[in-house]
């Protein structure tokens, strides 16, 4: 069995599929290998005609996912969150899957993992779940598509608070602003998640696939002009070429607070 296969497991109960992240040692960091396993698992369940897919971590985990594997971020002036970045591939795969994907969330959700949850069609969270987006704390230039995905899931004031401050947001507040659909006691998380999955699976899969694609296309129907896109990309290039970007990654590995100089 390959490492990718051990990092991600797949189960199926009738027309409901389950994908479990199993890299507890690295707190389910979104490494290239883990994401490859998730993408392949979605494809396998799609081929098996699953009508709903539950994406989860190990039962009782304290961290649903710690976000990007910082060790894989480039340090040579290359865009760390380009179009072909594994996280971007995973988000697009979830969005393109005709079966609704439900994030079953317990524990902390960090960095890019927040976008993974928000890219799912539904999120059911335990009362003790928390969400934090931390690129500003590390000097990492977040991707413009990723920011747009966040804005589709939550109101702009909260998106700014999460991006600018990097503070944790609890499950109840996340529910109030639309990041998660349901908040339940920890002991009821699995029951409520699979109840929702079965309700979806009982409906017409063709209609649901159509509706999911319609929502995806319409929610992305505000294109940027080429000039605006290039201007934003220029700002991002300035960040990942900066001393602050190098300092953020260095501070992470040295387990200290970064000393950003704005240059």
Regions from the PLM with identified roles:
Residues 62, 92-142, 168:
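Glycine-rich beta-to-alpha active-site loop
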Residues 124-129, 180-230, 259-263:
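C-terminal long alpha-helix characteristic of the crotonase
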Residues 47-48, 57-93, 109, 139, ...:
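Glycine- (often His-adjacent) and acidic-residue-rich active-site loop
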Residues 147-157:
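Hydrophobic, secondary-structure "cap" segments at the distal end of domains
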Residues 1-5, 250-263:
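Terminal low-complexity tails and localization/encapsulation signals of metabolic enzymes
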Residues 1-58, 92:
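Conserved CoA-thioester-binding segment of acyl-CoA-metabolizing enzymes
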Residues 122, 161, 165-167, 173, ...:
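Well-ordered beta-strand positions
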